[in-house]
């Protein structure tokens, strides 16, 4: 049973990683406290500790909205910061929610295309 759970958990991280790395300019590297960190240019989008926990930084107003909605928890180590924690408890069913949080952060950090650039 443990082997099956371990295999399924690896699948979750693989699916999230594959999706995030398909986005322009996103890279992945080992996180300093364990897990896998995702970055856009030099800024951290967030990181995943194994297949059980995703941590992402947001501006405080966004963080508060997410926590107040019940979608996420305050960060498990720094609860008063802008960081949030999303506990992966529903297996593969949590993948869309984790990806959506990373997309929110990505949209905040990706370079903005100016009207002048768009006309080129």
Briefly describe each language-model feature range:
Residues 1-120:
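Charge-dense, helix-prone N-terminal extensions
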């Amino acid at each position: 049973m443990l082997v099956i759970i371990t295999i399924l958990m690896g699948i979750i991280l693989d699916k999230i990683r594959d999706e995030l790395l398909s986005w322009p300019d996103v890279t992945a590297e080992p996180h300093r406290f364990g897990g896998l960190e995702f970055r856009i240019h030099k800024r951290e989008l967030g990181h995943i500790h194994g297949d059980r926990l995703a941590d992402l930084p947001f501006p405080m107003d966004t963080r508060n909205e997410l926590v107040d909605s019940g979608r996420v928890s305050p960060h498990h180590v720094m609860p008063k910061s802008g960081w949030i924690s999303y506990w992966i408890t529903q297996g593969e069913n949590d993948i869309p929610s984790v990806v959506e949080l990373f997309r929110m952060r990505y949209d905040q950090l990706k370079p903005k295309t100016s009207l002048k650039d768009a006309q080129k």
